[in-house]
């Protein structure tokens, strides 16, 4: 079965299901569909190079206990998706299944809103806000599907728009500390914060490095946060 959850967002599914003990359920998540109506993960797994068949992406598995209606919410993960493909290794009917989307993002209060007489502009605004929240998980990320990394240029380019709409000052203040932690003895900072050091800092260049100056300056400009400026000054100097 393929379920359309109605909106492309970030979070996890909440599955209610009943079936025979030992039945293995697999949930695969995607942002797109193929022409035949099946899910399309090609925009997500294009760079995936698995070393074994269990290295899968955007996928959850659950084995039924066979004790009436069971509830499964995947722990320790989140996905970006609109569509969910449900498969099982034993017969099920759609009447046995209930799926919900539990949307997730950092807890930030709304502080701004926009509405006008042009519905197209209103829709674009809502899409942008949804995309912003879908990429706010303790740090601003590049996507909720594949890398989920704190790419520094991606993050600061949407910072102003985000702060006009949400009180995300704590997210950015924490992110600046992550940037400081990536700095090397020669002053270089990584293009991703926090970083696993998969790439060294020499490739990033000024567009990514600029985040260590721009993010705290926006925090000061829009919230008066002088403490983050004090913390980052030795690294930025």
Give the location of each predicted region.
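C-terminal PAP-associated
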Residues: 233-236
């Amino acid at each position: 079965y393929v379920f359309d959850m109605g909106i492309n967002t970030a979070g996890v599914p909440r599955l209610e299901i009943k079936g025979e003990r030992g039945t293995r359920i697999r949930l695969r998540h995607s942002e797109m569909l193929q022409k035949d109506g099946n899910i399309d993960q090609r925009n997500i797994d294009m760079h995936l190079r698995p070393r074994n068949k269990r290295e899968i992406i955007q996928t959850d598995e659950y084995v039924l206990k066979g004790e009436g209606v069971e509830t499964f919410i995947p722990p320790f993960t989140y996905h970006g998706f609109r569509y969910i493909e449900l498969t099982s290794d034993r017969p099920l009917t759609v009447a046995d299944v209930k799926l919900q989307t539990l949307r997730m993002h950092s807890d930030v209060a709304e502080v701004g809103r926009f509405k006008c007489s042009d519905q197209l502009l209103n829709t674009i605004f809502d899409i942008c806000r949804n995309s912003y929240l879908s990429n706010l998980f303790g740090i601003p990320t590049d996507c909720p599907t594949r890398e989920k990394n704190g790419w520094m240029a991606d993050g600061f380019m949407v910072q102003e728009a985000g702060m006009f709409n949400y009180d995300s000052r704590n997210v950015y203040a924490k992110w600046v500390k992550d940037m400081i932690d990536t700095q090397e003895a020669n002053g270089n900072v990584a293009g991703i914060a926090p970083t696993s050091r998969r790439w060294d800092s020499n490739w990033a260049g000024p567009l990514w490095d600029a985040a260590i100056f721009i993010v705290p300056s926006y925090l000061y400009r829009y919230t008066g946060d002088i403490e983050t400026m004090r913390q980052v000054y030795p690294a930025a100097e």
